[in-house]
Amino acid sequence: MDFSGLFLTLSAAALFLCLLRFIAGVRRSSSTKLPLPPGTMGYPYVGETFQLYSQDPNVFFAAKQRRYGSVFKTHVLGCPCVMISSPEAAKFVLVTKSHLFKPTFPASKERMLGKQAIFFHQGDYHSKLRKLVLRAFMPDAIRNMVPHIESIAQESLNSWDGTQLNTYQEMKTYTFNVALISILGKDEVYYREDLKRCYYILEKGYNSMPINLPGTLFHKAMKARKELAQILANILSKRRQNPSSHTDLLGSFMEDKAGLTDEQIADNIIGVIFAARDTTASVLTWILKYLADNPTVLEAVTEEQMAIRKDKKEGESLTWEDTKKMPLTYRVIQETLRAATILSFTFREAVEDVEYEGYLIPKGWKVLPLFRNIHHNADIFSDPGKFDPSRFEVAPKPNTFMPFGSGIHSCPGNELAKLEISVLIHHLTTKYRWSIVGPSDGIQYGPFALPQNGLPIALERKP
């Protein structure tokens, strides 16, 4: 009787496993019958990487879209990819079915920034980190930072007065200093120069070949990364020795009841500073170019900022409420984010076979939502090549304007970025004037699209 029962149990289990295999086989069979999106894969191994990076990448994307539509396949950077360029497809990948597409970066980037950083994860760990970051960067948390940001802005502008400067490089210093004060609070002043030195070494190695041999940029970057982790370990140790309430990002991480490890805290601090600096610096660089190229817009922005200045006493600081009296300035920021589209695309990876609009996106393939194609679609934004802040007098339709990404992986620091841009623009337009030095056309492409040579300008105080 016992043997008979065992036999029946094992038989049922075997039958159940066979049924599962049959269902899985049917699903695989049905999914493999789906066609891949149209497109070309280029040469073996290299794919179409050369075609992508030997020209303006956006020309490559636009040509593909014209030929194949809003969903197409290609092969770049050693990976088969599906590129998508419609608001509906972007929403599908980033919002509706985001659980089917995980964030993905080259392994060398993960090693450099830290494998526990928020960018590389999804699920519960990502949700937990995102809440902690938002707690430090939401309006209620950053409103008291206005005087500190204003001090950094004024100090920066004073140092540029009467000089010719590389806009992008100087804006990186400004945004780096703002990032430090928002992430480390008062502690940053003791470590600023060491942190800055390490970050510039890290930056030089970020896009280098991942060859970890003495003398290579990657090796130097990894050494700098190790030193950064040690600096942060020292800051953590000192805070624990003298516990007090901190409203900065490090304080948010340290107060987490579930408890982050020191390695997790270090990885996320290093990653957030890296992300906060370059993207915002790129936006500021483009704003100065667009305002210089559009004197009527510059005049209107200056008038708006002068009205705020006239309502204040001599030497009186800006307030959070003042930054909410800048509607035109905010539209200039929005239009810059659309026109320049600092992040042309983002990377995701299909975690299983996915069907979209009758096409198969195979498991393991990279999926790239093309933000720039959406932002420059004439059916969405009329005359997309024109810099026109007035287009944002009416809110854009959902999923058509995604400068900070979309969904659960959208940038949690966008409010801080808008604040530090607004504060700098206030003092820049009311107290200074600038002109572009050398050719004003041309774009250079790297991690971000930038005006040629980082936009050299001459800046001087107004009489």
UniProtKB/Swiss-Prot annotation:
Variant or mutagenesis effect after changing C411A: Loss of activity
Per its record, how is this protein called by name?
Abscisic acid 8'-hydroxylase 3
Query: Where in the sequence is the signal peptide annotated?
Result: none
User: Which Gene Ontology CC terms are recorded?
Assistant: membrane
The entry's localization annotation reads: Membrane
Q: Where does heme bind?
A: C411
The EC category is: oxidoreductase
Give the observed phenotype of the deletion mutant: Plants are not affected in seed germination, but show a restricted greening rate after germination and increase the drought resistance.
State its cofactor.
heme
